[in-house]
Design a protein with these regions (language model features):
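Residues that form or flank phosphate/diphosphate-binding pockets in enzymes
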Residues: 40-44, 146
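Solvent-exposed coil/turn segments that connect beta secondary-structure elements
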Residues: 36-39, 63, 68-71, 80, ...
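Conserved Rossmann-like nucleotide-binding pocket used by diverse enzymes
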Residues: 16, 32, 104
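C-terminal/domain-edge helix-coil "capping" segments
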Residues: 23-32, 50-51, 56, 60, ...
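Short, solvent-exposed, polar/charged sequence segments at loop or secondary-structure edges
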Residues: 44-51, 60-105, 109-115
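Positively charged n-region of N-terminal signal peptides that target proteins for export
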Residues: 1-6
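Acidic/histidine-rich, surface-exposed loop or edge segments in extracytoplasmic proteins
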Residues: 29-39, 75
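Bacterial N-terminal signal peptides
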Residues: 7-19
Length: 166
């Protein structure tokens, strides 16, 4: 009898959490991020920085992100290669395959001691640019991660927290 009672209580708690989860995701846009192009940095560095941008976008809690492994799996099933996909048309095609509302593409660059981040979010359905963010940072690469946090907040349409701007 005790087992049935615990099972019943667990089911009630689980049922109560389902609407909560629906409320949390309500109104959020689904987004996928293409691997950013690296200019003056290695492909590995570009991939690492892209992954960091994705993580920071998730941390804003403003979007529902398609995870990299899910994205790769879906694209592989469709026989689609993401590498070299830098045009808006190609990115929109990827977004349609993934079933997302918006895509983010862009580049990381390095020229001397300066780093640049250029990001663009656009609608998969219409191809219209929703938002662009460009940042330049001069200094050690370690501090570039803070700039990526700011870009993540801005690309999803939010004001970055003050501690990210200091």
């Amino acid at each position: 009898m005790k087992i049935f009672y615990r099972l019943f209580c667990s089911l009630i708690v689980f049922a109560a959490l389902i609407p909560l989860n629906a409320q949390v995701t309500e109104g959020k846009q689904t987004v996928a991020v293409l691997e950013f192009e690296g200019r003056g940095i290695s492909q590995l560095e570009s991939k690492t920085l892209t992954d960091r941008l994705m993580s920071e976008m998730v941390n804003t809690d403003a979007v529902i992100m398609v995870e990299r492994n899910q994205m790769d799996e879906i694209l592989n099933e469709q026989g689609f290669q993401q590498s070299g996909c830098t045009s808006s048309e190609c990115a929109a095609e990827v977004g349609a395959l993934l079933g997302v509302q918006n895509m983010v593409s862009g580049s990381f660059g390095k020229l001397g001691n300066s780093y640049t981040i250029d990001a663009k979010m656009f609608s998969v359905e219409t191809g219209a640019t929703i938002r662009t963010v460009s940042k330049t940072y001069k200094g050690a690469v370690d501090n570039l991660l803070t700039v990526i946090e700011v870009v993540a907040w801005e690309i999803v349409g939010l004001q970055p927290p003050q501690d990210k701007l200091d």
